[in-house]
Structures are given as C-alpha cells and as structure tokens.
C-alpha cells in the first residue's frame, strides 16, 4: 500500500500560546509522533478525528490525549469549542508558553479551525487568524469552515480578571 505524503507538523505561536498542528499518526508511526511532541514540548494532544492509534504509549510518556472528534470538513460543535477554550484557558494560564498539540486526519481542517478559534478568542481578527495559520499550513481551512469562522463571535473566553488590579487581561499575555 502506498504511503500518503503528509505535511510536517507546524508550530503556531501567538503571545504565550503555542500549538502544534499535525496529522494523525498510526500505531506504526507513533514513535515518530511522540518524538515530534517532545521536540515541541507538547504534553497535551487534542484528537478531533476518529481513533487511529493507541494512546497508551503517549500516556506512558506523560502526554495527555483528549478525544473531541467531530465531522471532517465541518465546523466544531459548540461543546467541542467550549471544552477546547476551557482547556486552553487552564493550560496557558497555569503554564504560559506551553504547547498544545491538535490533530485531525491531515491537519488541514478541523485542527487549524480550533487553533483559529483560540487566536480569535485572544483578540485576533478572524481574517488575520486564517492568514496567520495558512502562512504556516498551506491549504488549511475549507470554505465551510471559513464561513463558520467569519460568522463566529468571540466572547473573549481566553481572558480573565487580574485579582490584583481587577482589570481584564488576556490569559496568554
């Protein structure tokens, strides 16, 4: 069987947020996937596609795998968006500069959309978020997902009240 030519993992950094967008590994390519995660310091993987590998080896290496699958080519359901933003708020507030890996099948649709949502929620315009991601991941985000991002209204969920000054701050400053 011919191997699919998959794009290399891509790091997207904005303020103190770091994401690793990648394609899904298989059990046969899992060791390379784990090496990539370690190289970028990713300790959390968000899997938004069907299961294609055993997550036990990752967990043995201290990497948490979260499963939030949704349909290929589609925008994420509200529950996935809420869970994603809650994860990021906690992760980047407690460990600024840490890296969260996210993957779908090819790393061109579902995963980049979630990263775009994070960028938008932290204050970036949707057009800028898409361009920022596409500069690093050519072909990312299809037209249906693009329309979703255009209509998406951020609620600034990656922001928090500073307990000392009582001012609203971005959790990723």
From Swiss-Prot:
GO molecular function, a single term: protein tyrosine phosphatase activity
Binding residue positions for substrate: 110
Protein's name in the database: Protein tyrosine phosphatase type IVA 3
Activity regulation, short description: Inhibited by sodium orthovanadate and peroxovanadium compounds, and by pentamidine.
Family stated for the protein in its record: Belongs to the protein-tyrosine phosphatase family.
Originating species: Mus musculus
Domain Tyrosine-protein phosphatase: 8-161
Induction: Down-regulated upon skeletal muscle denervation.
Gene giving rise to this polypeptide: Ptp4a3
Segments traversing the membrane: none
């Amino acid at each position: 069987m011919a191997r699919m030519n998959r794009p290399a993992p891509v790091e997207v950094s904005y303020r103190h947020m770091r994401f690793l967008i990648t394609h899904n590994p298989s059990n046969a390519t899992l060791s390379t996937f784990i090496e990539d995660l370690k190289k970028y310091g990713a300790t959390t993987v968000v899997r938004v596609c069907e299961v294609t590998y055993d997550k036990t080896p990752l967990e043995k290496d201290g990497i948490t795998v979260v499963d939030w699958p949704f349909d290929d080519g589609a925008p994420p359901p509200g529950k996935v968006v809420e869970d994603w933003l809650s994860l990021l708020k906690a992760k980047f507030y407690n460990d600024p500069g840490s890296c969260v890996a996210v993957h779908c099948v090819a790393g061109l649709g579902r995963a980049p959309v979630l990263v775009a949502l994070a960028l938008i929620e932290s204050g970036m315009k949707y057009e800028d978020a898409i361009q920022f991601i596409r500069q690093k991941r050519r072909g990312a985000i299809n037209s249906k997902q693009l329309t979703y991002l255009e209509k998406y209204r951020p609620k600034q969920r990656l922001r928090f009240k500073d307990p000392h000054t009582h001012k609203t701050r971005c959790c990723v400053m």
